[in-house]
A protein has these predicted regions:
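A composition-driven surface/loop motif
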Residues: 1-363
Length: 363
């Protein structure tokens, strides 16, 4: 369905069921904005991407597409895209989620246009391809800022290059319950990432859990971030360009082949890190003596084959706090995952016990 006249689609209640089939089809398409405040909305698209000769770019099927912004204030949304390069929500302007129950599933691979040929499940090297020549599956994508203020959000993406939630600008999470299972980055921002609240669980089977191409600021919320084996991370800031992770609050578990080393000169909340075996269903616990500071349950869909990592390369001591530790990577050790925890109650220079299943270590 395409908006007319004002170019804006507004849904304030009722039941909306849309199913479309065909290459690069759109369920809801607005030349302006899409605003949802209530209602039961189900959109399914089935159809792969295509190369548009006139625009000289790839186009893919999308459940909700807006040339302007997308704002969701409530309602129940179930969005499924099965074609290559398909997306749940995609907009050119900002995306704001204030409330609502949102479920997004994409199950197609990457669509690519290479040397005049179309590939519906491309698995080759994409480094030399212009962004207009490829379309990766995305659960939720915005070319502008992404702000999540609440709601229950579950995103599942399957296929090469499939990301969960992506902002091409700044991504901010203030509240909400968010679960993302993805192949590529679970949550990605092209600029800075701010996590100020919410309950967040992300699992990436072939890349980073949380990936910021700017700084990653964590000041609140409960976060469980799982990446794959080295060099991928549970949390990854763009250290090559001088960016870092900065802790000022919140409760975080990050597991991967490595993790970005927090910038201790700006962080006011310490962290601990070490290398240990992590398996689905494990409880990871951090203790100070007999006092439990934090406990996390590893998701059932986390694979122990994700763990690995190379030699440590610790740039900061395992119990680094504000002002302690210099630059360097927080890589994993041999035979285990890199595990990083930050939470209230940590003191710089103190030792703690970290356990995962039956294994235990002092950090």
């Amino acid at each position: 369905r395409e908006a007319e006249d004002t170019g804006t689609i507004t849904i304030a209640g009722g039941s909306v069921n849309i199913a479309v089939t065909g290459t690069a089809t759109k369920g809801l398409k607005a030349d302006g904005d899409v605003i949802v405040s209530d209602g039961d909305i189900t959109v399914t698209t089935a159809g792969g991407g295509k190369w548009d000769e006139e625009d000289a770019k790839t186009k893919a099927s999308t459940c909700i597409s807006a040339d302007g912004k997308v704002q969701i204030d409530g309602g129940t949304l179930s969005l499924t895209s099965t074609g290559s390069g398909g997306k749940g929500i995609s907009c050119d302007d900002e995306l704001v989620i204030n409330n609502g129950d949102i479920t997004v599933v994409t199950s197609g691979g990457m669509y690519a246009y290479v040397n005049g040929r179309e590939y519906t499940n491309y698995t080759g090297n994409t480094d030399y391809l212009d962004s207009d020549q490829k379309s990766s599956p995305k659960g939720i994508k915005s070319d502008g800022n992404v702000t999540i203020n609440g709601g229950n959000i579950k995103v599942t993406t399957i296929g090469n290059g499939a990301e969960g939630i992506e902002s091409k600008a700044v991504l901010t999470i203030n509240d909400g319950t968010i679960v993302v299972n993805s192949c590529d980055d679970a949550i990605n921002s092209s600029s800075h990432m701010y996590i100020k609240g919410g309950d967040i669980t992300v699992v990436a089977t072939d890349n980073d859990g949380l990936d910021s191409n700017g700084n990653m600021y964590i000041s609140g919320g409960v976060i469980r971030a799982f990446g794959t084996s080295s060099p991928e991370c549970g949390i990854d800031a763009n250290e090559e360009e001088g960016y870092s992770v900065i802790f000022t609050g919140g409760t975080l578990l990050a597991v991967g082949g490595g993790n970005s080393t927090p910038r201790t000169s700006e962080s006011t909340q310490p962290y601990v890190s070490g290398s240990m075996s992590v398996s689905a269903g494990n409880e990871i616990t951090l203790k100070s003596g007999d006092t439990i500071l934090a406990t996390f349950t590893v998701p059932d869909n986390y694979s122990s084959s994700n763990q690995g990592g190379g030699p440590g390369g610790w740039g900061a001591p395992a119990n680094a706090g504000p002002g302690g530790g210099g630059p360097g990577g927080g890589g994993g050790g041999w035979g285990g995952s890199s595990v990083l925890i930050s939470c209230a109650g940590l003191t710089s220079g103190s030792s703690y016990t970290m356990t995962s299943g039956t294994s235990s270590s002092t950090v």
